[in-house]
């Protein structure tokens, strides 16, 4: 009973956090500031003047960027280059620019970025699209120089940036990587239990039914298996299965109004409560330590005992199975389908985005840098190397030509 209440409490908090923060026309600027379009024109003149004078343009890039120095993947044993690669590549192509990169940990990243912006210490905000009070509306930049956006899978990170018109979505960031959710599953466990693999027709009820059947003693090996895994170490991930359930059922738990303060949240309706009940049932099919991020250490290996993982870790899990020679054992399936006559899947696509700070020193130069980050093929390879999917159609098509098993799932969702 204690475990059940703990899971429900965590799900409640996670759902609110997820809907409030990270996930996928001009907003009103802060008092006394110019419009983004005017600023872009002014900054272009500033950049030209700086170039003519021989002075270097400084772009301060701040945000969550993983590791600064090289690391070694403990499973694949491959070297993963640090984010210094960004500086080396960009400055080599743009000798008039000095990049100053500052990585921060994911812990309390939004608060830290808000503080840095208030101190006028950032130009490009890494993963800052959700912090709408400190970043630019990118509409005027895209209207002036946005042809490259057609080459991206996700053109923008949208947010409700104008609190006086909260029903309107505004582009506040450009995704550099994209992370679609899918169900990664262990074919051997499905085979041991005599069950069909997940496919593009599965509903959330199909997932739960299969998860329940595969939680218990494996009829072939005699070992304990679990039907499902939720990455409970990340609080928003605990809620994403529930959000996916709401999405598939077309259940509205948030009613957006014109003004932010008039927006209503309702988790007590019969339809909303079904989401809590459903995910609580899913939680019963997870390893006991999932709320602390434990229990999936062997997923992707020969000794795995988890049948399904609803995850965005497509690349890192694939790299793991590839290094162990187990790519044939694991499969990738779509997120559960949308119901009530709608087409598609209940997919959550996250990103690692870049945004322009409202008080950036040279906004035109920032836009050029972000455009380069989104389209450069060397950067795309670096993202893949680090276990992420580049948000770049050319790169994805090039990588999918190598027969990556989840390519179709990613493209279609």
Question: Language-model segments: which ranges?
Answer:
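Conserved N-terminal structural module of periplasmic/extracytoplasmic solute-binding proteins
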Residues: 7-10, 22-132, 146, 197, ...
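Hinge/lid segment of periplasmic solute-binding proteins
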Residues: 51, 127-180, 331-335
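Extracytoplasmic/periplasmic substrate-recognition and gating elements
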Residues: 57, 63, 92, 98, ...
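Short helices/loops that flank or line small-molecule/ion binding pockets
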Residues: 110-121, 190, 208-213, 295-309
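Extracytoplasmic/periplasmic solute-binding protein
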Residues: 166-176, 181, 206-264, 304-308
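Glycine-centered hinge/linker elements that transmit conformational signals in sensory
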Residues: 211, 256-291, 334-338
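Long, aromatic- and glycine/proline-rich binding clefts that accommodate carbohydrate-like moieties
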Residues: 333-334, 384-413
């Amino acid at each position: 009973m204690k475990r059940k209440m703990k899971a429900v409490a965590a799900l409640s908090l996670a759902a609110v956090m997820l809907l409030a923060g990270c996930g996928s026309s001009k907003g009103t600027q802060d008092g006394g500031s110019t419009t983004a379009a005017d600023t872009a024109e002014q900054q272009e003149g500033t950049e030209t003047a700086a170039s003519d004078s021989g002075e270097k343009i400084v772009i301060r890039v701040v945000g969550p960027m993983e590791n600064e120095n090289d690391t070694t993947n403990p499973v694949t044993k491959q070297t993963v280059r640090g984010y210094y690669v960004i500086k080396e590549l960009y400055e080599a192509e743009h000798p008039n620019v000095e990049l100053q990169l500052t990585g921060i940990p994911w812990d309390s990243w939004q608060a830290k970025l808000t503080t840095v912006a208030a101190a006028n210490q950032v130009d490009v905000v890494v993963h800052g699209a959700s912090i709408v009070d400190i970043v630019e509306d990118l509409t005027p930049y895209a209207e002036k120089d946005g042809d490259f956006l057609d080459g991206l899978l996700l053109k923008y990170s949208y947010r409700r940036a104008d609190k006086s018109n909260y029903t309107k979505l505004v582009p506040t960031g450009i995704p550099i990587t994209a992370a679609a959710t899918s169900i990664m599953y262990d074919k051997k466990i499905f085979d041991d239990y005599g069950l069909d693999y997940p496919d593009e027709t599965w509903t959330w009820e199909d997932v739960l039914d299969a998860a329940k059947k595969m939680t218990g003693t494996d009829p072939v090996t005699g070992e304990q298996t679990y039907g499902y895994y939720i990455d409970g170490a990340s609080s928003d991930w605990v809620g994403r299965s529930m959000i996916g359930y709401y999405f598939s059922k077309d259940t509205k738990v948030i009613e957006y109004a014109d003004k932010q303060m008039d927006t209503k949240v309702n988790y007590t309706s019969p339809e909303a409560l079904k989401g809590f009940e459903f995910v609580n049932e899913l939680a019963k099919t997870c390893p006991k330590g999932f709320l602390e991020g434990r229990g999936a250490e062997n997923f992707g290996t020969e000794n795995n005992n988890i049948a399904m993982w609803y995850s965005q870790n497509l690349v890192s899990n694939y790299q793991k199975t590839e290094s162990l020679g187990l790519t044939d054992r694991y499969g990738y399936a779509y997120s559960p389908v949308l119901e009530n006559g709608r087409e598609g899947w209940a997919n959550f696509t996250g990103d690692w985005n870049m945004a322009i700070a409202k008080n950036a020193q040279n906004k035109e130069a920032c836009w050029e840098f972000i455009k380069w980050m989104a389209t450069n093929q060397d950067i795309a390879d670096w993202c893949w190397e680090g276990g992420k999917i580049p948000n770049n159609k050319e790169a994805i098509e090039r990588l999918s030509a190598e027969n990556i098993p989840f390519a179709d799932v990613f493209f279609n969702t």
